[in-house]
């Protein structure tokens, strides 16, 4: 039977390798679902749509852009990101505000990266704590505090960068 320190080391290795795998998977899933969503909801010329949407969004007051951007961010944090994004646009709410300037491929890529880190960190922290409780494995001292700090930092950085992104 493995000792407690071996179990802790196994948990840490498992956590770090899964974090990288999950992160890459979430990014690939998000990119794929966004692209599928855009191929389904954008039958007209993409460049024409981008220019007209950017003009509309630029004339919106900052507070309106910020509020609708935060709504878009909340939808982007759902596990099925692409489906949430498609639903948001299919009901034409996305035409109202900040979602419009986010409809360029580069900004969309940034949004994918910004939402991937908090999704992965939150999922992994929950999974590690649940598995350790079920298997009665004691986590290394300070692990949960460090993991939650990392999660809070990733959410904070994502929100700050998102606000910068939407205010451009």
For the regions a language model picked out, list residue spans one by one:
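Cytosolic juxtamembrane amphipathic/interface segments immediately preceding
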Residues: 2-18, 136-142
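Membrane-helix interface motif
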Residues: 35-46, 82-98, 125-128, 167-168
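Perimembrane loop-to-helix junctions flanking transmembrane segments
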Residues: 44-60
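N-terminal signal-anchor transmembrane alpha helix
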Residues: 9-44
